[in-house]
Amino acid sequence: MADTTGRIPLWLIGTVTGILVIGLIGVFFYGSYSGLGSSL
């Protein structure tokens, strides 16, 4: 990861974290819906 500013902006951390959380929840519910279960 290229860190040019010396410090990662807080909004960037929040955005990435939000995307990851939504992605994990989406994958979990999609897996449960398609019958894969909790294969994580």
Curated annotation (Swiss-Prot):
Please give a single GO biological process term from the UniProt record: photosynthesis
Lineage, top-rank taxon, reads Eukaryota
Record keywords: Chloroplast, Membrane, Photosynthesis, Photosystem II, Plastid, Reaction center, Thylakoid, Transmembrane, Transmembrane helix
Give the main localization category. Answer: plastid
Checking InterPro entries in the record gives: PSII_PsbJ, PSII_PsbJ_sf
One Pfam family in the UniProt entry: PsbJ
The transmembrane segments are 8-28
Its annotated compartments are:
Plastid, Chloroplast thylakoid membrane
Q: Which cysteines are joined by disulfide bonds?
A: none
Gene Ontology CC:
chloroplast thylakoid membrane; photosystem II; photosystem II reaction center
SUPFAM superfamilies on file: Photosystem II reaction center protein J, PsbJ
Q: Does the keyword rRNA-binding apply?
A: no
How is it placed in the membrane, per its record?
Single-pass membrane protein
Q: Which PANTHER family match?
A: PHOTOSYSTEM II REACTION CENTER PROTEIN J
Tell me the subunit arrangement: PSII is composed of 1 copy each of membrane proteins PsbA, PsbB, PsbC, PsbD, PsbE, PsbF, PsbH, PsbI, PsbJ, PsbK, PsbL, PsbM, PsbT, PsbX, PsbY, PsbZ, Psb30/Ycf12, at least 3 peripheral proteins of the oxygen-evolving complex and a large number of cofactors. It forms dimeric complexes.
The free-text function statement in the UniProt record for this protein reads: One of the components of the core complex of photosystem II (PSII). PSII is a light-driven water:plastoquinone oxidoreductase that uses light energy to abstract electrons from H(2)O, generating O(2) and a proton gradient subsequently used for ATP formation. It consists of a core antenna complex that captures photons, and an electron transfer chain that converts photonic excitation into a charge separation.
Q: Which family does it belong to?
A: Belongs to the PsbJ family.
Q: What is this protein called?
A: Photosystem II reaction center protein J
Q: In which organism is this protein found?
A: Sorghum bicolor
Q: What is the lineage of its organism?
A: Eukaryota, Viridiplantae, Streptophyta, Embryophyta, Tracheophyta
